[in-house]
Amino acid sequence: MPQGFQVTGRVEPETHRIIFSIRGQIDSRVLIDRFIEIYAGIDAPWTYDRVFDYRRSDGLVEHVDVDRIAAWWAGHIPADAPRSKVAVIVNNPLDLVRARSVNDQFPKDDRQTFLSLDDALSWLDEGHK
């Protein structure tokens, strides 16, 4: 992994969420490799709501790598998998718009993009209380 670039993923069993934290200058290929590695270590990851926190990162995910994770995800989730919620947290209004451009590649996800963790968590909690 490039120096200063870090991708972590943790499962929160009490909320049934996977929380991804991305820090540093994004290396698109490495980022997607790490997502796949984390997902592969979780039983039925498609049953979890997910948070992707990009607030402490810089750079863009290349389209070829978005295509790669979308294809990997589609190939690993069952056809009858329920929809899950995905909150993407970014650090500026431009990325807010950019992040939404990939929503159609993940048809089983109810995806929303946010500028704050609090707003993302409030949205994830809706309907789960």
What are these regions (language model features)?
Residues 1-129:
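Amphipathic, Lys/Arg-enriched alpha-helical "gate/interface" segment within cytosolic domains
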